[in-house]
Design a protein with these regions (language model features):
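Conserved P-loop/Walker A NTP-binding site and adjacent catalytic elements of P-loop NTPases
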Residues: 21-23, 29-205, 212, 230-235, ...
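Conserved segment of the helicase C-terminal RecA-like domain
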Residues: 330-333, 337-339, 345-386
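Non-catalytic terminal extensions of ATP-dependent helicases
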Residues: 288, 307-308, 393-394, 398-798
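Compact beta-sheet-dominated globular domain cores
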Residues: 802-840
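Conserved C-terminal RecA-like helicase domain
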Residues: 79, 87, 94-103, 238-313, ...
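Helicase-associated low-complexity/disordered flanking segments
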Residues: 1-40, 44-48, 256-284
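Conserved two-lobed SF2 helicase motor
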Residues: 114-129, 285-296, 306-325
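Conserved interdomain hinge at the start of the Helicase C-terminal
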Residues: 212-236, 243, 300-308
Length: 840
């Protein structure tokens, strides 16, 4: 029986409240006073702003709101900041209200979009609000994690629905809202409904606070001994979190029995990367690591172990994600300051409470603990004073350590102020974009009046409003000049005085706004060119968001190599530094793509909100014939391998979906298959997540996660595996061409081909030739022969060298071990010979 079966025959507020309360009681749930108050306001039609601590049951209030909307025959929207949380809520609401009554919109997928209960991201709702405004069929909006309103890049999406949906009842929820008086007044003015602020500082699990001056290892040891674990240690960089995990390996965290349970739960889980191998050691010791740069499967494993109560300590960052279910008894702050991208500053009250509020597990703990470490130099000074004892002479002789230069200090007073402080008032992040104007112009009615309302009746101060008005005028003029908008002499049947000359829905995609530009740019490429497949990749890569960490690593590598070359050429220091400023990361087809974008944006102005950005990540990895591990190692990205994987997965999805089948050459199809298999073998959860979002009726989120941990054999995808083999062989050709025999020795030492063996073999080649080709022809299928011998569990492979004379007499022979390849998720091969082909 679903919650929808409990709907009363009429929408009387008392009947609604009684029906929902009875259902909750049947589930063994006793409503907290704040929940009761919020639900009473919801059923009477009031807007509600709910600010209660983490773990106080805001989700139950949201369910009650949806229940009320359904009883009143209204469409109700639930929004969350991330797609994973939207997906999770979708399945939760399906269980409550039945799959036929719940839909989902994420930008990537649309499921049952006509359902009366819709789960979506804030951006999706904002897009609907801009396009349809007061005409949208939306009777209620439940906005979870409303503090995202103040996010610099995304906050606009939390404001637009409030401005544009006066017909809706709003329920705004967060644990860290601060002063919301202006929102109360604003919502009442716009919607004509009373607005109730429901606030409670009472936590289901009370918190106690402590400021300590002991070394952090001593602090952690004491927390473990006093049964205050699991402890979440807050760091302000991912590197610090990993370093802390390593430093804690000297503390005995778990009993033998607990370690056995950890090993049992880990089972056959594959730690496929360099960081994964370190993580395996940490978690088996009872130490977790959790941050956004990790592979999703590693984060999920840490969460699984934590939920089973097997981890004593989790080393993470201050950005413990929304919707991440990591049970914590104690939160330990290593500092009360952070670098925010511009400067080091004291934590804001909202930041502090957002993470401190994670302490204490409802249903498990009777108390939660929040501990803050003093600065290291203060701790060392306290230690020295303690050693001196009570002797005044000894204490005077203690040389106090000074804070590092530029250090932003904190103290117990800082800690006390943060504890007492309410979260800061939410700051408006309104912004004007091309798509905003286009969406409003596409609506029925007077677009000028609608835009004036948006620009002058938002939450911005007047000075900012004037800036937005100037930008809107500039965008409108560009739309007129580009012929995208035309004025009408008389209003049309729907009251428009201006109209679009293009079909916005066909040309604009919320999740891939530059996909139509990519489609137009494919026509600029020559299908007969040897670089066609890679050029197609470069077009698609230019439309993807920039992964800053990867691009910075590529730039650092390019500059490092350039410095070495300039030193060898005797270039003076000042000139070297001047030249270095011009060196950046690789940008294939930059001139072509920037010109094409300039032309395209004149007739498709909405793309101007998303500048094209040439880059080479997929192309770079493919041209270097690198595996995932080799790529992250080469660019020193092991600590942010999750970001690398997310980019690769996004690129695979874009390549697969954006490029029409008739434009996919054999080489390009091979490359796409290779990329998809590479992502799946490293961590299939991102691709599985997309598939599950598109087909939620096939499996639940939990089933999709379980599937992600059960990796398919890499040899099962024969086409992709051939490319992996080809890349593995060609990687050796490239290294041989660069005379990197030491790297070759590291690759093949186990099969008898150490650096000396490779050097000796290649000496013969260099005696005959002065170059070894590594261009498109050199890696083509004509120079690679594969003899499949599944009966013996292997493939025999021969890679021919592209010598400058075209003799094709030299090459590499190897055997590919199929079973080992499946075990490791990559092409595992053993070099058998390097030399003239007659000798192989």
């Amino acid at each position: 029986m679903t919650l929808i079966d409990q709907l009363p025959p009429n929408a009387d507020p008392d009947a609604l409240f009684e029906a929902f309360s009875s259902w909750a009681e049947d589930q063994g749930i006793t409503l907290y006073p704040a929940q009761e108050e919020a639900l009473m306001e919801v059923v009477t039609g009031a807007n509600v702003i709910l600010s209660t601590p983490t773990g106080s049951g805001k989700s139950l209030v949201a369910a009650g709101a949806h229940f009320t909307a359904l009883a009143q025959d209204k469409v109700t929207f639930y929004t969350a900041p991330i797609k994973a949380l939207v997906s999770e809520k979708f399945f939760d609401l399906c269980k409550l209200f039945g799959t036929e009554n719940v839909g989902m919109l994420t930008g990537d997928a649309s499921v049952n979009s006509d359902a009366p209960v819709i789960c979506c991201t804030a951006e999706v709702l904002a897009s609907i609000a801009l396009r349809d405004g007061k005409y949208a069929d939306i009777g209620q909006v439940v906005m979870d994690e409303f503090h995202f309103y103040a996010e610099p890049d995304r906050g606009w999406a939390w404001q637009i629905p409030i401005l544009e949906l006066p017909q809706a009842q709003f329920i705004l929820m967060s644990a860290t809202l601060g002063d919301m008086k202006r929102f109360e007044e604003d919502l009442t003015r716009r919607t004509g409904r009373p607005t109730s602020m429901v606030r409670s500082a009472t936590r289901p699990v009370p918190l106690s606070y402590e400021y300590v001056t002991t070394p952090i290892t001593d602090t952690i040891t004491e927390l473990l001994e006093t049964r205050q674990a699991p402890v979440y240690i807050v760091h302000f960089t991912q590197a610090q979190a990993v370093e802390r995990a390593q430093s804690l390996m000297s503390i005995n965290m778990c009993t033998r029995e607990e370690k056995d349970k950890i090993a049992e739960l880990i089972g056959n889980f594959r730690f496929t990367t360099k960081f994964g191998q370190n993580l395996s050691r940490y978690v088996r010791h009872g130490i977790g690591v959790h941050h956004a740069g990790m592979l999703p499967k590693y984060r999920r494993l840490v969460e699984k172990l934590a939920q089973a109560g097997l981890l004593k300590v989790i080393c993470g960052t201050d950005t413990l994600g929304v919707g991440v279910n990591v049970p914590i008894r104690t939160v330990l702050f290593t500092a009360l300051t952070k670098y925010d991208g511009t400067r080091v500053r004291t934590l804001r009250a909202r930041e502090f409470h957002q993470i401190a509020g994670r302490a204490g597990r409802a249903g498990f703990d009777t108390a939660g603990y929040v501990v803050a470490q003093a600065p290291e130099h203060v701790i060392e000074n306290e230690k020295a004073l303690a050693k001196a004892g009570d002797d005044p002479k000894k204490r005077r002789k203690v040389v106090r350590k000074k804070a590092p230069e530029g250090f932003v200090a904190w103290s117990d007073t800082t800690f006390e102020k943060l504890i007492a402080a309410d979260p800061e008032a939410l700051t408006s992040r309104f912004k004007v974009t091309n798509i905003m104007l286009l969406s409003v112009i596409a609506r029925p009615g007077d677009a000028f009046k609608a835009m004036r309302h948006l620009l002058e009746d938002n939450h911005e101060p007047r000075k900012a409003q004037l800036r937005h008005i100037r930008r809107a005028i500039a965008i409108y003029r560009s739309l007129l000049d580009g012929g995208v908008v035309e004025k009408l002499d008389t209003p049309d049947a729907e009251g428009r005085t201006i109209r679009l000359t293009v079909d916005l829905q066909q040309d604009f995609a919320l999740n891939q706004p530059l996909s139509t530009f990519a489609l137009a740019s494919f026509d600029l490429l020559d299908p007969e060119s040897p670089s066609y497949a890679l050029d197609m990749v470069s077009v698609v890569e230019s439309t993807l968001d920039d992964p800053r960490q990867i691009l910075a690593a590529q730039q650092n590598k390019e500059r490092g190599m350039a410095v070495g070359a300039m030193k060898a050429d005797g270039v003076e220091y000042e000139e070297r530094m001047e030249r270095l400023q011009e060196i950046t990361y690789p940008k294939p087809l930059e001139e072509l793509l920037l010109h094409a974008y300039d032309v395209y944006s004149k007739s498709h102005p909405w793309v101007r909100d998303h500048p094209v950005s040439p880059k080479s990540i997929i192309r770079d990895m493919y041209e270097r014939a690198m595996t995932f591990t080799e790529f992250t190692s080469y660019y020193e990205l092991a600590r942010t391998e999750g970001i690398v994987l997310r980019y690769l997965a996004s690129a695979f999805k874009a390549l697969d979906h954006t490029i029409p089948d008739d434009l996919k050459s054999e080489d390009l199809q091979d490359l796409i298959e290779w990329l998809g298999e590479l992502v799946r073998q490293v961590d299939s959860s991102l691709l599985d997540e997309w598939e599950q979002l598109a087909n939620p009726e096939v499996e639940t989120a939990e089933q999709a996660q379980e599937k992600a941990d059960q990796v398919k054999p890499v040899t099962a995808n024969a086409r992709a595996f051939r490319v992996l083999v080809r890349n593995a062989m060609f990687r050796r050709v490239e290294l041989a061409a660069l005379d990197h025999v030491n790297v070759l020795g590291e690759l093949d030492g186990d099969s008898g081909w150490d650096a000396d063996a490779w050097g000796e073999a290649m000496d013969g080649y260099w005696d005959e030739y002065d170059d070894l080709g590594t261009g498109p022809d050199a890696r083509g299928p004509k120079l690679l022969q594969i003899e499949e011998d599944p009966a013996h569990g292997l493939w025999r492979v021969r890679q021919t060298f592209a010598d400058p004379s075209g003799d094709h007499g030299w090459g590499i022979s190897a055997e590919v071990d199929l079973a080992a390849s499946d075990e490791e998720g990559r092409a595992v091969l053993r070099v058998t010979s390097v030399g003239e082909l007659g000798q192989l």
